[in-house]
Amino acid sequence: MNKSITVDSENRVDFRNNVDYCVGTGRWGLALTEEYLKELEFVQNEIGFKFIRGHGIFHDDLSIYHEYEEDGETKLEYNYTYLFRIIDRFMEIGIRPYLELSFMPSQLAKGTQTLFHWKANTTPPKEYRLWNKMVVDLLKNLRARYGEEVLEWPIEVWNEPNLPGFWFKGDMDEYFKLFKETYEAIKAYDSRFKVGGPAICGVMEEDWIREFLTFCKRFNLKPDNITRHHYTVEFPETIGHYDYSKLEDSDMRIANLQATRDLVDTFDEYKGTPIHITEFSTSYTPRGVIHDTNLNAAFLAHQLSHLGDMNELYSYWTFGDVFEEKGVPNSLFHGGFGMVAAGNIPKPTFWIFSFYKHLKEFSEACVLRDENAIIVKSEEGYAGILWDKDNEDLDIEITLPIENDEYTIIRKTVDEECCNPLKLWHDIGEPAYPTKEQTELIKSCAFPLITSDVLKVEDGKTIVKSTVRKHGIEYFEIKKRIFTPDRGYNYEKVISTH
């Protein structure tokens, strides 16, 4: 497939690149493990997310909520030992919590329904008074330890209450009560905290958003952001441990997000309220095999070029494969949500986030966006990302206006031939538990192919030609060449003499 693009350097595309705003994680308690922290450090060193959002801040494994009997009375105390240990480490790594308030401590729960391998209680509180007290005490203690910056940590009430497994019977009215109680308790403590919801996913999402805003309007609640999730596959076929899904149309899924923006804006009271996509990916299961592929990265390249159009925040689910919703993973590559596999092996998806972060650092002045490319311009030159989510290679020719001079073009390429750790793992026998040597071998082929060239511009423009292989992504930068050769050194003679 062939394609030609001509860039107008004076053109400006309304492109909002918030790729590094937030990233997802498995439950909070996993942050007490060594492998988890190694993966998070690896991600932060290359990409550097601002916030991290995960489940289970009130789950029993963090041991925050305690009821005990004394002198014939039921008394209450809180324990923040593990939570502070986790957040201290987060802050050392350079990331802050996005506070999803979930799930229910077993002593506070009204029922016994649980979810996941780790038994998250997904029932309402037995007393909302005790829930509110716990939430406010949490915020007070966070503020006492970490200062006024805590006021800027976003808060989300629960997770996916429209799904019966995540909230008892998927009871809309009961969730609205939870939101109202929580919102009013937090705002009564300090109105500057930013509180959002309803954190829905997939099922009856339009009805939930409409009814949620109608409820908020009725009770004069003004959520600081509207939260929802965004996944882009059809219902999976499950074989053994694994889920196989077909991707939905990327433009259709972007249109679905725009429909949420449009719906929110039909309410005068909430017009312009920021929308946070607090989870997004392709597959919504932690055994979705597409997550480990090059296609996953190429599909997300297109999504990332549009997610900022209608959403202030979009948080990829998740940064790493330390994750236990369906139990402990059975193998190195298992369709895990993470952009990094065990042993700090970056998957292709890791690199599309890295590329968008580099693009953001290069410039926010977007001069072109289409189905296969996004290009920005700065005083230094140009940078761009190319992708091909189709099943045949794409030969692309880009004409760029640029002043006469010499330039260096650097390309970083990730595709099924040059950066495909999944294939190497498969080729050596799909070891479930790779040895140290095998892990290093797999990791060695998990990095982009870097190439370079010199562009000599003499007529005010240059033409960049690239072949983006199927399911491939490419990042490029074009900057002026600063040539400072030493006396007597001739590169052309070096490479031709021998």
What are these model-predicted stretches?
Residues 432-498:
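C-terminal beta-strand-rich structural cap/linker in extracellular carbohydrate-active enzymes
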Residues 277-397:
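Aromatic/acidic polysaccharide-binding cleft in carbohydrate-active enzymes
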Residues 39, 233-288, 312-321:
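Glycoside hydrolase catalytic-domain groove-lining segments
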Residues 9, 30-44, 141, 206-216, ...:
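Short, acidic/polar
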Residues 287-325, 378, 404-450:
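Substrate-binding clefts and catalytic carboxylate motifs of secreted carbohydrate-active enzymes
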Residues 370-427, 470-477, 482-485:
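Carbohydrate-binding surface patches
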Residues 47-248:
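Substrate-binding cleft and catalytic face of glycoside hydrolase catalytic domains
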Residues 1-48, 470, 480-498:
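Mature N-terminal, pre-catalytic/accessory segment of carbohydrate-active enzymes
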